[in-house]
Amino acid sequence: MNPFQYSKPADIHEAVHLSSAVSRFIAGGTNLLDLMKENISRPEHLIDITGLPLNEVEETAEGGLRIGALVSNADLAWHPLIEQRYPLLSQAILAGASPQLRNMASTGGNLLQRTRCYYFYDATVPCNKREPGSGCPARTGLNRIHAILGASEQCVATHPSDMCVALAALEARVHVQGRGGARVIEFADFHRLPGDAPQRDNQLADDELITAIELPADHLARHSHYLKIRDRASYAFALVSVAAALELEGDRIVDARLALGGVAHKPWRDRAVEASLIGRAVSRETFSNAADAVLQDAEPLEHNGFKIKLARRAIIRALSDAAVAGDRP
């Protein structure tokens, strides 16, 4: 770990004015400290934001929720309003990491965690995400955990977050503050596909700080389900995950949300497939057709072709489980 300057600002204005291209904000540090220990991230300045007033969950006038960026993953998962109104989010958070990590990890930090690609974490090998232009050995190497959707010649890494898959399905919005003022980013636009710049995971500028996540009022809570498929029962990242939510009138689908994790550089959502579900009857055939449509452009690598079949089955199961989910207030 390299030497660094440490600051603890008293307010958001001071925090964003301390930031620069060589600084990093730190809260729980559950990913950043690992990256620093492995010499993957080498910030010259750490800005401790744990003293900022960003740790509340508040109701909005529109019937949604505003979640402060410093609310811990554990507190968010068990918050009564989240359990009641957004059970999909609670399920996703509790499927990730371990109790100890969830106690420390912040909501804002969860959005910023970096890929768990083996090659990204090995500073002795090339990696376009770590060193742009150096190459992507995962394309021809050990690529069992890598992307089957939205990848590029430059990068086949996947996004590791469970929480973000649910936030994508819930159409969250990300509130950020920079020197130039505040702005709101639609969750669908927050994370990037790798393209020719895989070193950029998201749309944040160097001086911008996530201050809150906003959830719109949700009418799909009753019929929702988060399914995570992984190599072991706990403390493992998803090979494939699915956040599914339905609004039903009888056995007819009125609205649908479907997001996948473990398959792309960002949570993967196909709005055209969601739209195709509307008006359809709840059935295995309906869900099978949706799964096929989501995966029609999947491009497997040498070792991860199994993910296509796995994702197909996971989509069908998650939608089926969402359709029969028990009554929720």
Residue ranges of model-derived segments:
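C-terminal structural segment of proteins
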Residues: M1-P329
